[in-house]
Amino acid sequence: MHSYIRPYQHVALRLPSELTKIVRLVPNTVVYLGKYGSFPANTIIGRPFYLTFEIIDVSGENNDNCLRIVPPAELHAETLIADGEGEGDDVEVNEEGIPIRTNREIVDDASTQKMTAEEIEALKKVSTGAGREIIEKLLESHSALDQKTAFSLAKYTLRKRKKFLKRFTVLPVDVSLLTNYMLEGKEAMKTMELRDESIGLIGCWGNVHHGGQSSFEGAVASKPNGRYLVIDETGGLVVAAMAERMGILYPHDQEDEDQELAEGSEENGERQQTNAMAQALARRRHMAASGNSITVIHANKQPSLSLLRYFGYDQDNPDESHPLYKHMKTVSWMQLLDPHADTIYANEPEVIPDETLATFKSNRRSAYYKKRSRWERVRRVVDEARAGNFDGLIVATLMEPASVLKHTVPLLAGSAPVVVYSPTVEPLTELADLYSTPRRTAYITRKREIIAQHSLQQSLQGQSQDNEKKPQEPDFSELDKDFALDPSLLLAPTIETSRVRAWQVLPGRTHPLMSGRGGAEGYIFHAIRVFPSHQNIQAAGNPSRKKRKVAAQQESATPAESGSGVDVEMQS
């Protein structure tokens, strides 16, 4: 993540009302913040994050310098007011013990404020002090201000600051901020009401981490290599969270990209000089990472990953300098289950010699290179996905989990974690039942019975001794009727949930805040991929301790001789 604001970058603006607005900073444009005013985007481009600005209205000018950086001392003074606990509110009592000054007799209605709404609106138009003049006028015209305690006065002042101060704080857009932004807005269903706590559980149980920069051949011995299989229907939020953990979410600095491209051009220099195809594909290859990659399975022609645009990656027009350009791969369900039914995978473009290509026009030659490179990319990604050996499976979909795991779990390597997210617990309880121990035992027992019956039939028919005929495999179609999926492929299925709630802690009134958001809880199913053994394994239980036996039972010792230090021989 960059430490300063860059052009064409999405940033989050924290307003005084504690609301967050995400905007894209386009140079030479104006950013509008509603009632808080507007400012030119060029005034904050190039500045560091986490600065608080005040919008100063400058009439008669081009508003080139209409922002003021709020110093930390001023911010800290306001924070002390907001977090104060009423220091200096020691209530004086009279001789009878009755408080002299409280808020009980104060009636907070519109009559205490002498300024009308029309006067406040007129003052907004002529005010140039970022709202401070309006706050001062409101405090002066309040008739019951002297009756307030110090703490109630601080709360009143803070409430007016949130309403009239024209301030904003620039924050970088990360996964946690975007999750809360989508959850608190009106688009929570687009992300399946995924919360920050659930994202943490997904990354933890999925063992999502950076897979290293080594090549695929060099990293085979040091598994895992960071290849993850993902089904994401949250608009790309799960993919963004995984990419953040893997270090491939945020674009790198241009200096690092130039150095990387220079090194790549030196390594491929000879190949570019000898092959015309390599010259056309000299630019950065799309979906070419062999490790530390995310393979997204989608049901449509293109995956729905619209939320990745907040991190500088547009699925329709991807930037070659972005890490996701190489490290994120997309495969459709048709390409995964029946690749020859896909027109792009099945129809290979004709290979045209370089001599013939030299006679083509530039636009025709470019179209041929694009078509050929697209077929090679689809072929490579699909074959790699069907080969399997992934290091983890992350599922966040509204489809039936059993139908998804039936085709994706066999693609995982041994000890690979499986994580399934669902807003409700019912689909996950059914999934946990399908992988439960009783079902696994029944599946293995039934499978052994089928194998035993098949062996008996072969021995009776004499096929086992016939070398000319190939032995037939047992028919496991009956297992598919009784079991929706193979329960012996996953071990230790578990369902978990986690949710952070803000509580009101007061004597006798401790409960969750009534203003807290409801919605789905969000549940996580996780298990471990295992390979079932093809041998009959029987548990023998814990062996009992060996019993000591005297070697020569004929020479039994008397009670007096038993403590004479005679060695006792152990027999196994």
From Swiss-Prot:
It is found in: Nucleus. Belongs to the TRM6/GCD10 family. PANTHER family: TRANSLATION INITIATION FACTOR EIF3-RELATED, TRNA (ADENINE(58)-N(1))-METHYLTRANSFERASE NON-CATALYTIC SUBUNIT TRM6. It comes from Aspergillus fumigatus (strain ATCC MYA-4609 / CBS 101355 / FGSC A1100 / Af293). This is tRNA (adenine(58)-N(1))-methyltransferase non-catalytic subunit trm6. Heterotetramer; composed of two copies of TRM6 and two copies of TRM61. InterPro entries: TRM6. Residues 456-479, 538-572 are annotated as: Disordered. GO terms for molecular function: RNA binding. Coiled coil: none annotated. Substrate-binding subunit of tRNA (adenine-N(1)-)-methyltransferase, which catalyzes the formation of N(1)-methyladenine at position 58 (m1A58) in initiator methionyl-tRNA. Signal peptide: none annotated. Pfam families: Gcd10p. Residues 456-465 have a biased composition (Low complexity). One of its GO terms (cellular component) is nucleus. Keywords: Nucleus, RNA-binding, tRNA processing. Residues 466-479 have a biased composition (Basic and acidic residues). GO terms for biological process: tRNA methylation.
